[in-house]
Each structure stands twice: as C-alpha cells, then as structure tokens.
C-alpha cells in the first residue's frame, strides 16, 4: 500500500481490498505424505472451517483488520487534502493571487495567511460575482465520471451535461456579456465593436458631453447585448417618448446592437436617457454609448440621410431641422450671408446693449433664424458682437437725447405692462409725514429741470426707506446711480452725460463738502462739462439729481451755499414690514406707472408730441433694416 504512489483508482469502482485469514500447516521443506494423492479432485469439504466467523476476540490480541483500516483511512484523508489543494482555491488566498503569485501561499495557505500587520475587518465589495443559478430553475451540471471496468484502463469523462436547451443559450449569452463586463475599459470595447460593425467611429456621429447633467433634446444612442425578442416591438415602445426616431439593428457576438438617433418631446440629460432606454431595452447602463449628435457636420447629416433611404432603418416622425438644413436642397439654397443690420435691429428691439447678453441671446436663435445661423458659422463673431453693441448704444443714446422728459416718462410707462395702484405711493408719503402738495410742486419743478430746483434731498434716520423710495423711482425712470467711492477718479461723473435722471445714495460729510466745492453748478441745473474716459469731454446740462443722506444739508452752516439749491424732505419713521417680512408699501414699477398717469396734468407733463400721438398720428419707429418691396396685387 505504501509503495503505490497516487490515489487515482481509489473510490471510483469496485476495486476495494478483502481480507483472508488462513492457517498454514506446512512449511517449505516438509515432506508430503503419500496418503494424499495430488490428482484427487478437490470437493471443497476441507475448506469448511477456512473462514473464521467467530465474533469474540481475545483481549490483547493484535487485529490486523483494524490496523489496515486505520492506515487506509489516513491515506484517504491525505488524498482528499491533495485534491482540495489542487482544485479548490484556499479561503486564505487573496483574490489578487491570480495576478500576483506567491510561492509561500501556494505551498501553504496557512503560512501565507500569517501577517504581522492588522487587517481591515471590512468586507471588500466584489465587483463581479461568479455565475449564480438563474431564477427559472435551470442549472448547468458539470460532472466528471471515471469508470474503470475489468480488463480495460480507459477513462470516460463527461465534461458538461446540459439540463435544458434554454440553459445552453442563456449560458452562452451570459458568458458573452460577462466577457464584455470584464474588459479593462468597457467604453473602449464598445467603441471598438461599434467601429467594426458600422465602419466608422461613434464620435463621427456624435459630439461628447462631459457632464451627465447637460440637457439636450437630440441624442445618438448605441446599445449592445440586447435580447433579440425586443427588436420587434421597440419602435412601438419608443414612439410615446419621442418626436423623431431613426432605428438601426445589427447582430454581433454580444447579441443585438442598436443605433438610434432620436428627438425627445422634452429636454433630457444623459442619466435620464440611459434610465429610459435601459428600462425599454432591459440592459444595464454600462452597455450604452449616449451623446448628442453633431449638428453642423455635413458628413454626419449625410450618413443619417443615406441610411434612412435603405430598408435597414426604421424612421418615424419629422426629421430635425438641422438634419433637413444640411440634406434638403431647399434649405441649402436658403442659406445666406450674415447681415449685421438684422442683428442690430434685433438687439435694438429687445433693448440689449450689453455685449455678453447680445452674444448669448442671438446664438440661441440659430435654429429658427437664418441670420443667427450664419452668425454662428462666421469666424468673426466677437467683432460682430462688439459692433452690434456699439451701434445699439449709439442709437439708444441719440433717441434718449431727442426725447423730452414727458416723452421719456411715457416711454418708460409703455414698457410696464401691468397696472398698479397709485395710492401706495401716496400712503407711504403720508406715513412719513410728507406734505403731498409740497412734494408734488417740488417734483414738478424737479422733472422740468428748473434752476435752483434741480436737486431733491431725502434725509432722516437709518432704515426709514429713503433709499428704497429713491431707488424705485430711479428704476422706473431708467436713471443712473452715482457712488462717491469713485470720487478720486476724474470720470466718476461720466454717467451724468447720458442720463435723464440720476441719484446719489447716502451722502456723507465728505460728499457734501465735495458738492459744495465742485458741484454747485450741477445742482443749479445749468450746463457743465463732463470728462469721459478715452473720449473728449462733453458739455451738457446736468440731469435732475436725487440725494439720500442722514444729514440735513439745508440747516448746516457749513454748506450755506447749498441751502437754496436743494429741496429737502424728511423721512422720520422706520420702514414698516408685515409678519412675513414683506414691505407694507409696494413701491414697484407698476405703482409708479399708475402714479404718473394719475398725476400727469399736475406735473405739467403734457407735450405737443404726446398730444399728436393721442390724436392718432403714429410715431416713427426706428428701423435700421431696409424694407422689402411688397408684391403688386
């Protein structure tokens, strides 16, 4: 037993040991009696007592059967241990042992498990679990059966026994998907498979979005490993979500492959699209490539157009305008060159004078406006934006300078669409104990720019609503705000050159000293010279000026030369708020609009130009775009 190496034949057939106990009466060299002839036929009667069936054993007598059984049991244990080390992974070996072999662990897992450092007690999350039995009850049985028959040494091995036909197909599908998942970079594998199937890169049709939160209506999707039964009804499932769909199906070793160009009914980000299609296709999000299409690449548009003509594609809905513009001849002929005058007219109509706002808002019109699309296709966008903003500022400034105060107030009233309540303004003035008649007289002279009445001072304790009242009036009339913090610059009064009304908030002692020394002529309402940065100085009349302060300049002897130039109103009470923190008196644009309409005649704002417009004479609307000749009837 000890001489036989290996245990390949143990436990696999009927080749066990049996024990024979015999009594030997003769030894080598004994003389055989002649009374026992050798040719006598053996009848078996002399073998009756050959096997000892007695149960009782003499105490202390050696039992060879028990000894042999113990030796065989020890050999079996050693053989099983060798098989376990050969075919079963040791629980003490790390999962990375396959990539980083270790001699000590291979020789002895227990020795490899010994560590001086403290190991983390946290369980490591396994990214990919081994194949588990499917929920339908079908399993794959792998068995190795070795049969050793008498008279032959051949070994028959059955590798895999499949329980059902469905299990074989599902197993192959799971094996292919597992192969895809276990790739080092899944996205690279998907890109490679897409290029092998379609002959072009996925990024030739789509543009990358780095953020998964960016919203878009048009998307290009490539999905892999789809079950073939979904292909028939996918179009029906997709139609409720989309306005347009271009569907292509191909097959590969991973299953069905979908290439989809779609326009959703509302904007979606990449996460929302992946969840929606993952639910419809019954695949994980990692098996999809999702990016928006290239909108300005003729080659990409031509690909979708040519594929739509073949019978390999299913199309529903109206094609997007960017696709039709690059493939339909009618749209191609309609493309025209960029016209700056149209852009300037658009900015003037919307009262856009900031370059950044002009650039952003006009770029949004590229899908519906031909001139905006030509603007995006130009290499001089920055120059066009700068020129457009400059021209708009020139037009608006010239138009403002030509208007009288009554025309300007009417223009500002027309910009407010809502109707308010003029009593809110009157109630606030009464709450501050301001004589309404005196205030209306001062406001009338203030708006007309009469000398010595060109400045109104609102003074009082803090938190009485002085700045809120003045800011609301300046906001409605479209005025400018000056800050004394810029008084060290020669250009801090430059905004007064283009304003109809101005405000100086929170004038301190230093500010009043500056006004007493340098701005007496401005408070009179007489023409004065303003220095402008990088431009020549301009001479113009100072617009009406509202000043808020905690100091009453009309009673301080330090500024006695300003007493006759400033009309003062005191706000003694704190500005009230309700329980929700909202102001009790709403000083909004709609209420100021109602106030000026109600007090139009009291403020002497009637003008001949306004009367002509009220009598039916239309005003000339500014147009910087040449008109088109109408067809004869």
UniProtKB/Swiss-Prot annotation:
Entry annotated with the keyword Ubl conjugation: yes
Q: What is its EC number?
A: 5.6.2.4
- UniProt modification remark: Phosphorylated.
Cited InterPro entries: Helicase_SF3_DNA-vir (IPR014015), P-loop_NTPase (IPR027417), PPV_DNA_helicase_E1_C (IPR001177), PPV_DNA_helicase_E1_N (IPR014000), PPV_E1_DBD (IPR046832), PPV_E1_DBD_sf (IPR046935), Rep_E1_papillomaV (IPR016393), Znf_lg_T-Ag_D1_dom_sf (IPR037102)
Annotated region DNA-binding region: the residues are: 169-335
Could you tell me the Gene Ontology terms of the biological process aspect for this record? DNA replication
- Biased composition, Polar residues: where in the chain? 158-168
Q: Where is this motif: Nuclear localization signal?
A: 84-86
Provide the residue span(s) of the region labelled Disordered.
148-168, 609-633
Residues recorded as bearing Phosphoserine in the entry? 90, 94, 108
Q: Which GO terms describe its molecular function?
A: ATP binding; ATP hydrolysis activity; DNA binding; DNA helicase activity
Recorded catalytic activity of this chain's protein: Couples ATP hydrolysis with the unwinding of duplex DNA by translocating in the 3'-5' direction; ATP + H2O = ADP + phosphate + H(+)
Q: Where is this motif: Nuclear export signal?
A: 107-116
UniProt binding sites for ATP? 460-467
Q: Which PROSITE patterns match?
A: SF3_HELICASE_1
Q: Where in the cell is it found?
A: Host nucleus
Known SUPFAM superfamilies for this protein? Origin of replication-binding domain, RBD-like, P-loop containing nucleoside triphosphate hydrolases
Q: Name one GO cellular component term.
A: host cell nucleus
Per UniProt, residues of the SF3 helicase domain are 434-584
Glycyl lysine isopeptide (Lys-Gly) (interchain with G-Cter in SUMO) cross-link located where? 541
Q: Which family does it belong to?
A: Belongs to the papillomaviridae E1 protein family.
How it assembles, according to the record, is:
Can form hexamers. Interacts with E2 protein; this interaction increases E1 DNA binding specificity. Interacts with host DNA polymerase subunit POLA2. Interacts with host single stranded DNA-binding protein RPA1. Interacts with host TOP1; this interaction stimulates the enzymatic activity of TOP1.
The protein's name in its UniProt record = Replication protein E1
List the source organism.
Answer: Human papillomavirus type 54
Q: What is the lineage of its organism?
A: Viruses, Monodnaviria, Shotokuvirae, Cossaviricota, Papovaviricetes
